[in-house]
């Protein structure tokens, strides 16, 4: 029998993370979507030149789009094309997923936000979170819990020595 090929690539499959989203919102559910990209965008993503911190997802005419995502063009890759780093990109979701998201936005008042951008084999995928906004006191509670966890870890670490 032959051995299975192992992934020998060094590094992570993650291109960009939106850490701010988990601080600003309660994430109720997550979906994975493909993206419609141009050639220069794929080359830039291979170099990790993307930012999804200020991006949001909306549904228009039964299709999902992401706005506010920035992909910085490479100088050598996009010489013959006029590159728009902040263009609106179409997301590839199934009809059932689109209907589910559309219903949750309209009925429950939820928001769609981008959580992470990553490689799945040779395809770029984006993780979308169905989110509800946090109030200021919720953010404070999260910070208190995080600080309490750090203190517990410090005490346990010193007790084990």
UniProtKB/Swiss-Prot annotation:
For this protein, the record's InterPro entries field holds: SmpB (IPR023620), SsrA-bd_prot (IPR000037), SsrA-bd_prot_CS (IPR020081)
Matches recorded under Pfam families? SmpB
Q: Where in the cell is it found?
A: Cytoplasm
From its record, what is one biological process in GO terms?
trans-translation
**Which GO molecular-function terms appear in the entry?**
RNA binding
- Predominant subcellular localization, coarse grouping: cytoplasm
**CDD domains for this protein:** SmpB
> What role does it play?
Required for rescue of stalled ribosomes mediated by trans-translation. Binds to transfer-messenger RNA (tmRNA), required for stable association of tmRNA with ribosomes. tmRNA and SmpB together mimic tRNA shape, replacing the anticodon stem-loop with SmpB. tmRNA is encoded by the ssrA gene; the 2 termini fold to resemble tRNA(Ala) and it encodes a 'tag peptide', a short internal open reading frame. During trans-translation Ala-aminoacylated tmRNA acts like a tRNA, entering the A-site of stalled ribosomes, displacing the stalled mRNA.
Its recorded name reads SsrA-binding protein
Q: Which organism is it from?
A: Vibrio cholerae serotype O1 (strain ATCC 39315 / El Tor Inaba N16961)
């Amino acid at each position: 029998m032959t051995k299975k090929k192992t992934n020998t690539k060094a590094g992570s499959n993650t291109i960009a993370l939106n850490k701010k989203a988990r601080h600003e919102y309660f994430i109720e559910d997550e979906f994975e979507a493909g993206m419609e990209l141009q050639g220069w965008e794929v080359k830039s993503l291979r170099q990790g030149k993307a930012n999804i911190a200020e991006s949001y997802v909306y549904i228009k005419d039964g299709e999902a789009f992401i706005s506010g995502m920035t992909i910085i063009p490479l100088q050598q890759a996009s010489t013959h094309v006029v590159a728009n780093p902040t263009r609106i990109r179409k997301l590839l979701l199934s009809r059932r997923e689109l209907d589910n998201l559309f219903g949750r936005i309209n009925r429950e008042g939820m928001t769609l936000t981008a959580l992470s951008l990553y490689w799945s084999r040779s395809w770029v995928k984006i993780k979308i979170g169905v989110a509800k906004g946090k109030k200021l006191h919720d953010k404070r509670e999260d910070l208190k819990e995080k600080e309490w966890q750090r203190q517990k870890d410090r005490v346990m670490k010193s007790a084990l020595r």
